[in-house]
Amino acid sequence: MAIDFTMHIPQTDVIAQERIPQRKLYTGALMPAMGLGTFNNDRFSFEDIARAVCGALRIGYRLIDCAAAYRNEKEIGEAIAQAQKDGISRESMFITSKLWNDKHRPEDVIPTLKQTLADLQLDYLDAYYIHWPFRNTHAPGAQKEDRHPDSRPYCHELYMETYRELEKAVDMGLIRHIGTSNMTRVKLEQVLRDARIRPALNQMEMHPSFAQPEFFEYLRSEGIQPVAFSPLGSPTRPDRDRDEADVPVLQQPAIVEIAKKHGIHPAVVCVKWAVQRGQAPIPFSVYYNEYHSNLKSVTEDPLSEAEMKEIEKVDTNCRLIKGVVFLWEGAKSWKALWDEE
């Protein structure tokens, strides 16, 4: 059944493109400094997400972040097609997707990419990420203590086998840029040493409680645009990624106080901070008022330098998306995934 994309959007809610900050990639291409994520965490229907994508495009979003692992690319493809019928050009959009861990074998990469393109009803992607730097997978509903018998530590040679297929995809015109994701500096330095086509983006967890300042500055020094997932601290993340020591980002006193001062939600403070810092955040929401206020926030009432400094103090190096389900037998801690032990 076709998805009903009927919605009433006041013209005053539409945000002009020239008001939205842009990021210039090393290729010279421009990418919006703010986008919409599409990971539903099994809490919303694929149709709800597709309607949010269509609504977001109608009000001014142009960066849409997808992934095959989210299992909703066919529905999102319908939303993108509808937006084009509405008069929003493909060239104005920046659509990204990601290659899942079980498709890293060289013979699987291009066919998987072509399936994503078919599902999204596109001829090319603006960027294609390697979702995780491992071929490790997990069973549906896996818990913290579960270990897949085939999981292994990072292997650079295997990663580069996959990466070289993305380089071929650039040559074929199927993708415009290569993205890395869930990486560390140690791993990325090896990729930069061996890559024929440099990655243009790196997607990573970033929010005020986990700002990753050293890695962030390293990426910028290498001409790689940091893209922030979970920019609000992922309050709806899976239980397997929760620990008692986790810090709820939106409840941080400094964030709450700044939000009160500006008359906005703490989530909007996080979005403003991310964009003003130089990131490209991709918060997810199916709720119109939320994704509208997020985009509108980056066009007005910026945080002061003093407020940005206050938010810097919130950083507790608290990683929330730990990836425990990708650990291998014998691994002592999720930190092994991040080269921290």
Over which residues does each language-model region extend?
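Beta/alpha (TIM)-barrel catalytic core signal, keyed to glycine-rich beta->alpha loops juxtaposed to Asp/Glu
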Residues: 101, 132-341
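N-terminal binding-site loop/beta-alpha segment at the start of enzyme catalytic domains
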Residues: 2-93, 110, 232-235, 336-341
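Short acidic/polar active-site loop segments enriched in Thr and Asp
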Residues: 62, 123-126, 176, 200
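Acidic (Asp/Glu)-rich catalytic clusters
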Residues: 24-26, 77-90, 117-122, 192-195, ...
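CE4/NodB-like, metal-dependent polysaccharide N-deacetylase domain
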Residues: 109-130, 168-172
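Short, acidic/polar
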Residues: 43-57, 105-120, 161, 186-189
